[in-house]
Amino acid sequence: MLETLSRQWIVSHRMEMWLLILVAYMFQRNVNSVHMPTKAVDPEAFMNISEIIQHQGYPCEEYEVATEDGYILSVNRIPRGLVQPKKTGSRPVVLLQHGLVGGASNWISNLPNNSLGFILADAGFDVWMGNSRGNAWSRKHKTLSIDQDEFWAFSYDEMARFDLPAVINFILQKTGQEKIYYVGYSQGTTMGFIAFSTMPELAQKIKMYFALAPIATVKHAKSPGTKFLLLPDMMIKGLFGKKEFLYQTRFLRQLVIYLCGQVILDQICSNIMLLLGGFNTNNMNMSRASVYAAHTLAGTSVQNILHWSQAVNSGELRAFDWGSETKNLEKCNQPTPVRYRVRDMTVPTAMWTGGQDWLSNPEDVKMLLSEVTNLIYHKNIPEWAHVDFIWGLDAPHRMYNEIIHLMQQEETNLSQGRCEAVL
C-alpha cells in the first residue's frame, strides 16, 4: 500500500521535483558567486483572472456554468470598457476561447491597449471569456472529484460537444441576445470547427467565427511538442499518469515566477514559453514575462494530450479513439472514430494565420482553407509564430483592429438588413 502511494506521489509531483532540483542548483550558484540580479515581479503574476481585470480598472463578473455531463466551468466577463462606460442599451456579445493548457488569462495578459479582451470591451462589446474543463479555473464537477480518473476522461471532443454549447447558451440567456461572436485561438478554434460543423442549431447562434492560429489537423506541425506526441500512448501515460497534464500548483507557479524574475534567465524563460509554437521574441513585451509564465500552464487532461497524439499520427480531425470497437460504439455510435467534416460548417468565418507558426503550420492551414465553405476573410502574417496572436506587440494594428472592424461592419449590416461584412 505504501509503495503504491509513494509511486502515485512521485508521478503526480514529478515536474515539481525536477524544478526543485533546478532551483537548488541556482541557490547554490547564488551562494558561491555574485548574487543574480532580479527584476521586479509584476503583481498580476499572483492574481486570478478577475483580479487582473479589476487591477486594470475594468468591471468584471464571474459565473459558473454547468455542462450537460456535469462539469462546472468558470466564465469571466468584462461587461463594458473604460471608453463610454455609461453607454446604455445592450452591447454585442463576444465569446473568447483560449488554447491548449491555457485559460481566460490568454486574452488579458498584456496591458489594456495590447490585450484583445480589454480592446473589445473598450470598442463597445460585452466580452465573455471561457475556461475549458480541467484547467486551473474549471476543476469542479457535480459528482466527481479531481482525484478520480473519471473526472479526467475527456479531450477536446467533450469541450466542443458539451462546454461550448453550455457556455454559449448561458451567455444568450444571461444577456437576452440571440447570437454572439465567437473568437477561438489554437485549440479554441478546434473546438469551434467541431461544434459548428456537427451541431447546426448551435452554429445558428454564431454571427461570425474568428479563428486565430486555427488548428484542424496537425499533420505538418513541426513543434518539438508534436514530436513528443509521436510516442506510444502507454509511454505518455507512463510519463504523466492518467489524470491532469501541466497544471501549475501553487508551488510550481511561485517557482516559475521566481525563475522568470532572474535577469540572467530572461531569454531562457521566453524561449521555453515559445518552444512549442515558434519564435518571434522581438514581438513580446518581456516586462510581462512573469505574468505570461504564471498563467500560461493552466492545465488540461492527459486524455486530451492523447487525443492530440492521435491527431498527429492520423493527420485528420477525428473524434477520440477509445481503443476498442465496443468502447467507440458506446461513445460515438460507430466502431471507429468519427471524422469531423469542417466543410459542413456554414458560419461566416474569418481567419488569421502565421507564417512561422509551428503548430498551425502553413501546410495544414492550406488544407483547412479548402474545407471552410463560408470563408469571408483570411490574412497570413509571415513573421508571426503561435503566441503572437495573443501576446504580439503588433497584434492590435495587424489583427485586433480588423476583428473589430468586421464585427462593427456586421452590426451595421444587421441593423440595415444587409448580409455580409467586408474588410
From Swiss-Prot:
Domain (AB hydrolase-1) ranges: 92-392
Residues making up the signal peptide according to the UniProt record: 1-33
A single MF term (Gene Ontology): lipoprotein lipase activity
E.C. numbers: 3.1.1.-
Protein known as: Lipase member M
First-tier enzyme category under EC: hydrolase
Subcellular location: Secreted
Family the entry assigns: Belongs to the AB hydrolase superfamily. Lipase family.
Gene field: LIPM
Tissue expression notes: Exclusively expressed in the epidermis within the granular keratinocytes.
GO CC annotations, alphabetized: extracellular region
Record-annotated active site: S186 (nucleophile), D357 (charge relay system), H386 (charge relay system)
Source taxon at top rank: Eukaryota
Organism: Homo sapiens
